[in-house]
């Protein structure tokens, strides 16, 4: 184990400048003339009787964004009122308090590492959810449906298909609930082998039968930014991510010395549902591409790979090894800060 003095602390101002430069990337978002002009109205969900599907939400908020927490409270309240079974995996930094009081459906972890923990927390949660739920729905904690019966629609579709991307159209909302952007799912149009980020969205929500989810060998190490959705899409549909010159799929294959495989034995589908993404800052500030480039440069200069920098705890949570924790924490905390989710 290295002492703290042996870790070379990178200049945080340089890292910030790198990220701010990369933020000007091409988001590949076309001008859309047919975006609906109405404002989204939140609707209560239908109370559920058949509860065979567990909804998984994750929450980590290292910079204490009010809007991210407010969005989670909105989603949680709707699920509570409809008695929809859900599980929240909450992660807090070691010096911070948890937001939620202990509950059977809230799994809580603490860490002293800054990572993009979404996929890792999903992986941790699935291991803890009772086996009585034979279906799961992975859902971002800022997603709403306009159909009160969405839970039943998804669950019934999972009776026919093992994998479901549970929407036809995804809408990005402004802070006033007007619609900023509109995209399709990635599973209905398979004529291309590339994810068309201008028209398609690989994220927000996926649903699975429980046994098939485990059979997919879910990759939970996309710890730099939200690349897990692209990796999952490739495993399901064989659609490649070419959002950047250096695909994030190739990035993680290289960094973790693995090869993602398409699971062609399971049928997949979508649902005739609309989903709506609650606002938390400008889309340009997400920096999904920029942070990968910054970290790639760091790794190249040191001739090291992520697989050598990460360790897994007994409870399945990933953390930086002590030797690299200082450097990576500086980079990742700067990334989370520069996202400006409360703007």
Identify the function of each model-found stretch.
Residues 2-53, 61-75, 222-343:
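C-terminal catalytic/acceptor-binding lobe
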Residues 50-54, 76-89, 104-105, 134:
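Short loop->beta transition adjacent to catalytic acidic/histidine clusters or analogous donor-positioning motifs
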Residues 59-64, 78-82, 89-99, 143:
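A conserved acidic beta->alpha catalytic loop
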Residues 89, 164-169, 271, 278:
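Short glycine/serine/threonine-enriched helix-capping/active-site loop
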Residues 90-133:
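Active-site-proximal specificity loops/subdomain of glycosyltransferases
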Residues 98-101, 150-151, 175-180, 281-283, ...:
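Short aromatic-enriched loop/helix-cap "lid" or pocket-rim segments at secondary-structure transitions
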Residues 133-144:
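Short beta-strand-to-loop acidic/aromatic patch adjacent to the donor-nucleotide binding site
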Residues 145-238:
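Conserved catalytic core of nucleotide-sugar-dependent glycosyltransferases
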């Amino acid at each position: 184990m290295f002492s703290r003095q042996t870790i070379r602390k990178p200049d945080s101002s340089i890292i910030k400048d790198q990220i701010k430069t990369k933020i000007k990337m091409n988001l590949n978002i076309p001008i859309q003339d047919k975006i609906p002009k109405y404002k989204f109205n939140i609707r209560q969900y239908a109370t559920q009787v058949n509860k065979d599907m567990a909804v998984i939400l994750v929450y980590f908020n290292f910079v204490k964004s009010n809007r991210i927490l407010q969005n989670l409270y909105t989603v949680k309240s709707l699920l509570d009122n409809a008695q929809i079974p859900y599980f929240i995996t909450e992660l807090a930094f070691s010096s911070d308090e948890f937001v939620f009081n202990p509950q059977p459906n809230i799994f809580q972890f603490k860490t002293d590492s800054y990572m993009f923990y979404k996929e890792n927390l999903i992986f941790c949660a699935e291991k803890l959810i009772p086996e009585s739920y034979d279906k799961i729905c992975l859902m971002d904690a800022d997603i709403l449906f306009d159909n009160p019966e969405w839970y039943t629609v998804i669950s019934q579709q999972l009776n026919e298909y093992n994998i479901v991307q549970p929407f036809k159209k995804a809408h990005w909302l402004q802070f006033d609930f007007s619609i900023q952007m509109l995209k399709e799912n990635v599973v209905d149009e398979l004529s291309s082998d590339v994810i068309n980020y201008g028209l398609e969205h690989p994220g927000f929500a996926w649903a699975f039968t429980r046994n098939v989810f485990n059979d997919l060998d879910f990759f939970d190490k996309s710890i730099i930014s939200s690349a897990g959705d692209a990796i999952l899409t490739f495993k399901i549909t064989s659609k490649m991510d070419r959002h950047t010159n250096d695909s994030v799929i190739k990035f993680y294959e290289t960094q973790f010395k693995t090869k993602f495989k398409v699971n062609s034995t399971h049928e997949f589908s979508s649902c005739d549902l609309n989903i709506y993404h609650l606002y938390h800052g400008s889309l340009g500030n997400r920096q999904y591409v920029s942070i990968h480039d910054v970290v790639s440069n760091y790794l190249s200069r040191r001739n090291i790979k992520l697989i050598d920098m990460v360790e897994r705890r007994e409870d399945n949570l990933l953390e930086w090894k002590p030797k690299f924790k200082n450097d990576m924490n500086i980079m990742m905390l700067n990334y989370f800060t520069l996202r400006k989710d409360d703007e």
